A protein has these predicted regions:
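N-terminal leader/linker segments that precede catalytic domains of diphosphate-processing enzymes
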Residues: 1-219
């Protein structure tokens, strides 16, 4: 990836024009950008990992063919129309929206959603055009791996992992998310006692709202 190269990230990617069409056809009554981002989350997770979230009609034996079609450029709207399927965009729980400005060549307005993983028996495999490998791990374990230097975790990912690590399961996290607004988070720098800290608002459900800039750079 051009952004956060080598870092551990959640599945996801760019919202495509077709995602807006799918959101209008299948989406709940939400803002069009929110609906399209939910579609992108569904599509990118399937493309990148082979896991189908929010698509109850898609059988496990059909996953590989649908994934290949998406990766080959077939539009999701055409696949859904041909199959006559409905996707469950209301199953995606919005919990964060970040737009960091770290003086990168590009900035990313990124929406984060939680969704229940469906039961599955197949092995998830990486889509190698953008990622080197994938793995399942709890938020707590991933934070421990980062603290030991086994993986690199950028500032927004660490803050979201810390939120996830506070709860036991999807239902508990969904309830937690509903207690806080989803507002655009753009971190800023503050100085305190000769140190610089990267900070975020303290009313959005994050247990840690600042981190020393030296540690942020270390990832």
């Amino acid at each position: 990836m051009a952004f956060a190269a080598g870092a551990v990230v959640f599945p996801g990617g760019r919202v495509d024009p077709d995602d807006y069409l799918v959101a209008r056809q299948h989406g709940p009554d939400v803002h069009e950008a929110d609906g399209a981002a939910r579609v992108a989350a569904l599509r990118e997770t399937l493309e990148e990992t082979g896991l189908a979230v929010g698509w109850p009609a898609l059988q496990e034996r059909e996953l590989a063919d649908v994934r290949r079609a998406l990766l080959a450029g077939t539009l999701l709207s055409d696949i859904l129309a041909a199959r006559g399927d409905r996707i469950a965009l209301d199953s995606f729980v919005p919990f964060a929206r970040w737009c960091p400005n770290f003086k990168e060549a590009r900035t990313f307005d990124t929406r984060f959603y939680a969704v229940a993983a469906p039961p599955h028996g197949h092995e998830l495999t990486v889509e190698e055009a953008e990622h080197s490998h994938i793995f399942w791990a709890s938020a707590h374990r991933t934070l421990m791996m980062a603290d030991r230097g086994e993986v690199s975790v950028i500032f927004p990912t660490r803050r979201n992992l810390e939120r996830l690590a506070r709860v036991a399961d999807f239902d508990e996290f969904s309830a937690h998310s509903r207690q806080f607004p989803v507002e655009l988070v753009t971190p800023w720098i503050e100085w305190c006692e000769g140190q610089s800290f990267l900070c975020i608002p303290d009313h959005l459900g994050y247990p840690v709202t600042r981190e020393s800039f030296d540690r942020v750079r270390r990832g």
